[in-house]
Amino acid sequence: MKLLYGSQNFGYDIDNSDKDWIEIVYPSWQDILNNKLINKEIKNEDGSVTKVKDIRCLIKMIEKCNFNDLQVLYSQEMHDCEDLKWFIEHREEIVKHNLRQLYFTNRGYVVSCLMSGNSKDMIRAYCFMQLIERAFSGEVMTLCDKSLRELRNQKDNQLSANEILERVDRLKELAVASPVHDGIVIKARKEIERLLKLHMM
C-alpha cells in the first residue's frame, strides 16, 4: 500500500516539489510476537523520502488526530490500497472523532511553523489554520486547497503570524467542550485485526 505523502495532499506544493511517499506494510509473525512495529524512513535516489509504517501504526495515527498523519486518508495518489478502503470510506468520522485532540495537536503544529518564520512554514501554518476551521465548520472535510500554491506568490495578501494564531484560538472553547466519539477508533482497531488475520492466513 503506497500513498503520496506531503505538500501535494494539502495543495501548497510547487512544480519542483519532491514526491514523498508513505508505504503501509503488514508485519511478520515474528514482528507480532515480539510486539515490534515497523516504522522507518528511506531516502530515495531522487531525493524523495519513503516512510514505511506497520499497518498497526494506523491506530496511533488516528488517535493523535494530526493532519500530517491523517493525510494518508486523503492522499492524491494511491497504489494497491484496497485494504484501506474501509478507512477511506470512514475518514470523515475518523478525522472528527476527537475535535479537542485535533485542535490542540494541530494548533501545536501551527505554532511551531509560525515560530520558524520562513515563508514555507507560514504557508503550512495558514493551511493548518484552514483545516482546523474546516473541521469545526460542519462541512465535509477536505485537505487539498490548490489556492495555497498561488498564496506563495502573493506575500502581501498573506495573514500575519498573529492573525493566524488569533483565528485558531477563536475555536479553543469549542474544542474544549467537544465530546469524544471513540466508537470509530474501536471499529478501526477491529478492521486492522480483520486485515491482519486475512493476511496471515
Each language-model region and where it sits:
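Active-site nucleotide-donor binding segment shared across nucleotidyl transfer reactions
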Residues: M1-N35
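Generic structural hydrophobic/aromatic packing signal, biased to beta-strands
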Residues: K2-L4, W21, L58, A125, ...
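A structural signal for short, well-ordered beta-strand segments and their strand-loop junctions
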Residues: L4, Q71-V72, R134-G138
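Conserved aromatic-histidine-acidic binding/catalytic patches
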Residues: I14, D46, S116-K120
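Residue-level marker of positions within ordered structural domains that often coincide
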Residues: Y26, E63, Q130
